[in-house]
Curated annotation (Swiss-Prot):
Coiled coil: none annotated. It comes from Glycine max. PANTHER family: LEGHEMOGLOBIN-RELATED, NON-SYMBIOTIC HEMOGLOBIN 2. One of its GO terms (biological process) is response to nitrogen compound. Belongs to the plant globin family. This is Leghemoglobin 1. GO terms for cellular component: cytosol; nucleus. The keyword Ribonucleoprotein does not apply. Pfam families: Globin. Monomer. Specifically expressed in root nodules, and barely in pods. PROSITE patterns: GLOBIN (PS01033), PLANT_GLOBIN (PS00208).
């Protein structure tokens, strides 16, 4: 991977801010997209036991944390070219036996959600910045398994 640029980091950060303008709505978009592609994912998230409920603080909190981790990964990539995570994050994903296809489903849902959040500001460049940041975060999580 080439160096993560200031522009890429700025694209991720600004679109994260757009996501934060309506976390309940975008959390619904995100988790609904995941469940449409992988209904069994419902069993991986205790807060989805009763479906996608935008008033559930665990649902919105988890979405905000995940999107924030990708944003933080963009910052790390710009600063040092690598993503470092807390080992506990790797442990949680290992315990749940998360597979590569599941990481892909989450990435697709994340991109769909950011696309909705930014509206007409969506671009291939913005998509690519989020993809790189997410892929590097996912690689760091898998490495910590």
């Amino acid at each position: 991977m080439g160096a993560f640029t200031d522009k890429q980091e700025a694209l991720v950060s600004s679109s994260f801010e757009a996501f934060k303008t309506n976390i309940p709505q975008y959390s619904v978009v995100f988790y609904t997209s995941i469940l449409e592609k992988a209904p069994v994912a419902k069993d991986l998230f205790s807060f989805l036991a009763n479906g996608v409920d935008p008033t559930n603080p665990k649902l919105t909190g988890h979405a905000e944390k995940l999107f924030g981790l990708v944003r933080d990964s963009a910052g790390q990539l710009k600063a040092s070219g690598t993503v470092v995570i807390d080992a506990a994050l790797g442990s949680i994903h290992a315990q749940k036996a998360i597979t590569d296809p599941q990481f892909v489903v989450v990435k697709e849902a994340l991109l769909k959600t950011i696309k909705e959040a930014v509206g007409d500001k969506w671009s291939d460049e913005l998509s690519s910045a989020w993809e790189v940041a997410y892929d590097e975060l996912a690689a760091a999580i898998k490495k910590a398994f």
